[in-house]
């Protein structure tokens, strides 16, 4: 069995793959804690695995992507001590299913490399990959496949938290469509601003990318809020895959083990 871990600034998502299946047997999302020790992580993962009757020795491979560099040695130690394996860490110099047309490839986040890997294998052709995470990232991969670059915008939750934190009378809200552009209350007005504002951001950046690179790019969405946006405002994404990052980790493990 393969344990894959995607460490983001806000959340960590992990899952178990078995026998080369493209869909994880199990997966879970938890808050990223930057103060955890390797033993605390080991205990956490052991508890998760035992929920599904999986013992540590059944894990024969491990890979992780991380945008929190301070956690990298802790993850390495956790895999070594608790699973007796050397985990693969995603980086731009590993074997990738695409080439990189980027003057400073070392600046590309591990999460973006993983997402591009899934698109190169599972969604061949010209793709715009949008990941709605702590940051909202757009990555562009052409038909060769070649990583061309991307766009990084603020994340939705970060922006919502900033508005609440920096104002005295605006309450926190749940992100959802208010159903109309003009709100009848403060909460509805904030919801309208974030919902339609984010729709405009997504559609506007997609439009500019297609204007620059061509109209025949498919748009693939992933991340925690992708299903919410797709259900309330269909048509932005040609395909959505909330587990796209975990699948990318599986692909890169197969290529590099």
Swiss-Prot record:
One of its GO terms (molecular function) is ATP binding. A monovalent cation. Ammonium or potassium. It catalyses: (R)-pantothenate + ATP = (R)-4'-phosphopantothenate + ADP + H(+). GO terms for cellular component: cytoplasm. CDD domains: ASKHA_NBD_PanK-III. This is Type III pantothenate kinase. Substrate binds at residues 102, 109-112, 186. It is found in: Cytoplasm. GO terms for biological process: coenzyme A biosynthetic process. The keyword Transferase applies. K(+) binds at residue 131. Pfam families: Pan_kinase. The lineage of its organism: Bacteria, Pseudomonadati, Spirochaetota, Spirochaetia, Leptospirales. Its cofactor is NH4(+); K(+). Belongs to the type III pantothenate kinase family. Keywords: ATP-binding, Coenzyme A biosynthesis, Cytoplasm, Kinase, Metal-binding, Nucleotide-binding, Potassium, Transferase. ATP binds at residues 6-13, 134. Pathway: Cofactor biosynthesis; coenzyme A biosynthesis; CoA from (R)-pantothenate: step 1/5. Its EC number is 2.7.1.33. It comes from Leptospira interrogans serogroup Icterohaemorrhagiae serovar Lai (strain 56601).
């Amino acid at each position: 069995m393969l344990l894959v871990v995607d460490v983001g600034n806000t959340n960590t998502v992990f899952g178990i793959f078995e026998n080369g299946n493209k869909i994880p047997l199990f997966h879970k999302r938890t808050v990223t804690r930057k103060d955890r020790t390797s033993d605390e992580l080991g205990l956490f993962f052991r508890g998760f695995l035992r929920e599904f009757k999986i013992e540590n020795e059944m894990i024969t491979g491990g890979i992780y992507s991380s945008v929190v560099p301070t956690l990298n040695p802790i993850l390495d130690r956790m895999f070594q001590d608790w699973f007796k394996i050397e985990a693969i860490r995603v980086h731009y110099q590993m074997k990738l299913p695409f080439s990189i047309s980027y003057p400073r490839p070392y600046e590309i986040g591990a999460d973006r490399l993983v997402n591009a890997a899934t698109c190169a294998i599972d969604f061949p052709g010209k793709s715009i990959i949008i990941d709605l995470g702590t940051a909202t990232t757009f990555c562009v991969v052409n038909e060769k496949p070649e990583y061309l670059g991307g766009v990084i915008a603020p994340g939705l939750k970060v922006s919502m938290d900033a508005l609440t934190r920096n104002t005295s009378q605006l309450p926190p809200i749940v992100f959802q469509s208010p159903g109309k552009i003009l709100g009848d209350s403060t909460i509805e007005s904030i919801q309208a601003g974030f919902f339609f504002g984010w729709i405009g951001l997504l559609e506007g950046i997609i439009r500019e990318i297609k204007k620059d690179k061509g109209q025949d790019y498919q748009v693939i969405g992933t991340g925690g809020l992708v299903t919410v946006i797709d259900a309330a405002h269909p048509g932005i994404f040609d395909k959505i895959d909330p587990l796209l990052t975990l699948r990318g980790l599986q692909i890169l493990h197969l290529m590099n083990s």
